Amino acid sequence: MHLLNLTLSSPTNVSTAVVGSFSGSKSQEILCVRGGTKLEIFKLNATTGQLDTIVSTEAFGTIRNIAGFRLAGMTKDYILATSDSGRLSILEFVISPTPHFESLYQEVFGKSGSRRIVPGQFLAVDPKGRSCLVGSLEKTKLVYVLNRNTEGKLYPSSPLEAHKNHTLVTHIVGVDQGYDNPLYAALETDYSESDQDSTGEAYENTQKHLTFYELDLGLNHVVRKWSEPTDRRANLLVQVPGGQNANSDRFEGPSGVLVCTEDHIIWKHMDVEAHRIPIPRRRNPLVQRGDKSRGLIIVSAVMHKIKGAFFFLLQSEDGDLYKVWIEHNGEDVVALKIKYFDTVPVANSLCILKRGYIYVASEFSDQNLYQFQSLAEDDGEQEWSSTDYPENGNIDGPLPFAFFDPQPLRNLLLVDTVPSLDPITDAHVVNLLGASSDTPQIYAACGRGARSTFRTLKHGLDVAEMVSSPLPGVPTNVWTLKLTEDDEYDSYIVLSFPNGTLVLSIGETIEEVNDTGFLSSGPTLAVQQLGNAGLLQVHPYGLRHIRAADRVDEWPAPPGQTIVAATTNRRQVVIALSTAELVYFELDPEGSLSEYQEKKALPGNATCVTIAEVPEGRRRTSFLAVGCDNQTVSIISLEPDSTLDTLSLQALTAPPTSICLAEIFDTSIDKNRATMFLNIGLMNGVLLRTVVDPVDGSLSDTRLRFLGAKPPKLVRANVQGQPSVMAFSSRTWLLYTYQDMLQTQPLIYDTLEYAWSLSAAMCPDGLIGISGNTLRIFNIPKLGEKLKQDSTALTYTPRKFISHPFNSVFYMIEADHRTYSKSAIERIVKQKESEGRRVDTLLLDLPANEFGRPRAPAGHWASCVRVLDPLANETIMTLDLDEDEAAFSIAIAYFERGGGEPFLVVGTGVKTTLQPKGCKEGYLRVYAIKEQGRILEFLHKTKTDDIPLCLAGFQGFLLAGIGKSLRLYEMGKKALLRKCENNGFPTAVVTINVQGARIIVGDMQESTFYCVYRSIPTRQLLIFADDSQPRWITCVTSVDYETVACGDKFGNIFINRLDPSISEKVDDDPTGATILHEKSFLMGAAHKTEMIGHYNIGSVVTSITKIPLVAGGRDVLVYTTISGAVGALVPFVSSDDIEFMSTLEMHMRTQDISLVGRDHIAYRGYYVPIKGVVDGDLCESFSLLPYPKQQAIALDLDRSVGDVLKKLEQMRTSSAF
């Protein structure tokens, strides 16, 4: 088996984000690391207030940290990146000719991989961009001086060591000293004594130190300048501005760092008295007597400079933002102050833009962009100052707690949301829309805690509808018109009906007008705004050129002939007559249409004609394309010296029904200018796209795609200011450019018969379309998104969900640890009120999706079972479980004693602890399914001795993985009845898959086991095969009777297959006697599976589904990851494809595609060498190579560059999207 790995949707979680002017302009961009492997740059769109993606590039390596820097005299920021390649990479973002990243230098500093003593975990940059420090978790610290050579190129110097043995590093940051020698601060813990002390006493006395390292630029040497003990719970350092202003003697700030510890924030600098303040916290209304107070830490921070001042925004682990500022007199700190600012989702990074926005890169779920409404000055919110405490807060022991009441957003305004799927905890791929959709939908359980969502992912672009209005009939075409060439907005909407034409005026309202000069008694074939102030109408019997209100020039069709097709632009008109002739018109300098004297005879009757828009600076477009009923398309010249000469001819496989010439930018074909594409819609529903040579009109690089059962209609459109093509078949498709690559995607919208661009005051960048007898005005808010997302809010973290066997209903289990359930909250509130204690219920009533929930001690759980309607995106019902009972598994089972009806079984644990793993008791809850799956009725529950981590229905019984045991249960009147079990599994049973009488069991740490059930002479569950390698299994799916695809906790997908002869031998043993007496092999089962495929995805795989993704396509393995990515493993169908893609992959590995210098084979084979899988993402980056390199690779493959690109597109579109 050979597979091709394709990414369908990139990872969405942001591990790190920095802000800078990476493009060199005055505007700022946000650089994000998505999924640890992808570099992405956002830019704020000043018009819409939204974030637009400028470039997104796969690094083919795990990026550990990034930072921006700028050397003196430079006009743009550069990027430093550390990764698992063991190299320090200097990257540049280049905006032209197409936005992309360039790797300027890669300095090797250690072994590959993410190791604790290899630098890369921490990256700190001198604020003046002169040097950087790269640190590891333990011991190693390297300092590089950043220089420019004689050619002006950046490069790092040889590394200067600042190692310290037996030292653990918590955080490193650059200290702002102005133009003094670069200084770095580190939080370090010396464990040398603890390592030698077996009593643990040395560990209890271990201190954490704040250490300053100075780079002496004169001596080119690093010294350990200052070190002082600090709070051992310190976890984060924040840079404080310092140094003198370049234009005055004023100090920018006091320098030093903010040390963020548990419950406190401390300002520290060398040999200066520190200032300490408490971190304000929320009151917990549910805290009980005897509960230990939970500490509060800062998890992210950002510093922002404004004119003559600066402030910090620090975020706690609850999501609360605090404004911190320092009152100082030169270099002397007067006071350190803090106040509550607002509450936003917990973030990995915070980025403040100069335009007054803050980007919150959330740890989980959607990332948000907020606009500052105020800086919380004089808002009445309580402030806490270091001067409020003795010795500026530097007293032994903790400071008194400071409390605040969280409030809805007051200083920030949410303006944009970047959808994010991470983490995907479970997913199913299934087509619940039936015949109305030719592709399945991806249903995913996403998020954590109160921000969790259930999401429906559909392939296509989202559409925002603005107007939907019924019409008196069913129109065939729709157009919009400007009155003059210089008009900003369209003035008319023209609708063509089979027996007439309707003209609507666009103003404050849309209303019918009659005095336009258009012929309204018959259908219209085309309309156009001609020249400066002319309008054109083409109808079956002639042309009407409306030059003024009282002047209409008409051109009648020859007697006995009609116009069957027409195409126009603002200076040219071509019509096709029913006598297989073409007539060409061109606008003369006086503004009149001049007919070319000769008619062009065609080889067959014309079915469609098209010309492109007039290029800027020219008087005409050069080519005309004509489709004829003899299954040919001709390219005809419109140049003065060769007018109506046929330049090229292409035979087709079916008659063309629509044709469209459009100039669209596609960097895979031409990296410098737009490409002229000829798009042809055929009678059989296929879209052909071919490239027209701009010199001789020859056709090349033809590609095809099946769009639907209906013959496509094609039309040019402007979408978000760029030329595009719309295709109307059984679905509506859009061909457009995104990140300089041509994309073809369907619209998630009602089927349209026709559409046109619309520019109006209410909709400057819209589209107008017709669907039946309804007029629709809509726009496409965001291009580039392959999957449209519809979400339903959940209460707790989703764990697993399953679908009803026959109805479109999902059953989901949710559970959160350290969270009070609803019954627990009611109990505690009643108990406190009975004791006469005040309970602030206002805090409990705050929206949990914005403020979270009060934290409970370990062992407390909140959980529920939810019934979902995925088509309506709504919750049908919710069943809350008992206090501290959490659901971990769910299945639908048919029981022999159940009357043939399905039952829902939920596995739960009570008082579950995670470390060590265990529970007070477990239960199997059984629910009857009523009213077509929409109602659940509790029947009974069965006690177990461990947590049921997985369940599955099996031949009228229930299989349950409970701890190390696999058990078989039968339905009873008051409980489930255990019939047999196998407790020979090593650690814990986490997955169960059933095929006939065969059971594939996934163990938590020891991979998969093949089992069979035998009822003669007694009921038995027998293991007959297992894996030879230990694997930490996360998900398993059956590929065929002998083969399984599995994912593990280290980001690997692997395919295991059982020898068919062994499989047949086991099936022929009705009693299992042979299995029982076979000799164990390698301390396991008698037989071993063979690994036939292995590939490292780079993120934990949470689900795998076998299903075809496109109409008529073959089955693929669709997987999801915890970082929010969706991908597919596509099987090859021929040995030629395997050889071609494998050879192309081999060539691409030699092209230094990785921005961080990671070896591709080592990356994709991180734990086990790659086997049987080709990296499709790497192969598709062939289109990004310079043309000479593309030619060299294509020559080795005995193909042209166009053939290689065509094959890559075909491999994706034939099985995925």
From Swiss-Prot:
Molecular function, one GO term: U2 snRNA binding
Origin: domain of life: Eukaryota
BP-aspect Gene Ontology terms: mRNA splicing, via spliceosome
A Pfam family annotated for this UniProt entry: Beta-prop_RSE1_2nd
Predominant location: nucleus
Presence of the UniProt keyword Nucleus in the record: yes
InterPro entries xrefs: Beta-prop_RSE1/DDB1/CPSF1_1st, Cleavage/polyA-sp_fac_asu_C, RSE1/DDB1/CFT1/CPSF1, WD40/YVTN_repeat-like_dom_sf, WD40_repeat_dom_sf
Location within or outside the cell: Nucleus
GO CC, alphabetical: nucleus; spliceosomal complex; U2 snRNP
Entry keyword annotation includes Nucleus: yes
Keywords, ordered alphabetically: mRNA processing, mRNA splicing, Nucleus, Spliceosome
Family statement drawn from the similarity comment of this UniProt entry: Belongs to the RSE1 family.
PANTHER family for this protein: DNA REPAIR/RNA PROCESSING CPSF FAMILY
Function, as annotated: Involved in pre-mRNA splicing and cell cycle control.
Assembly and oligomerization: Associated with the spliceosome.
Protein name: Pre-mRNA-splicing factor RSE1
Species this protein is from: Cryptococcus neoformans var. neoformans serotype D (strain JEC21 / ATCC MYA-565) (Filobasidiella neoformans)
Gene that produces this protein: RSE1
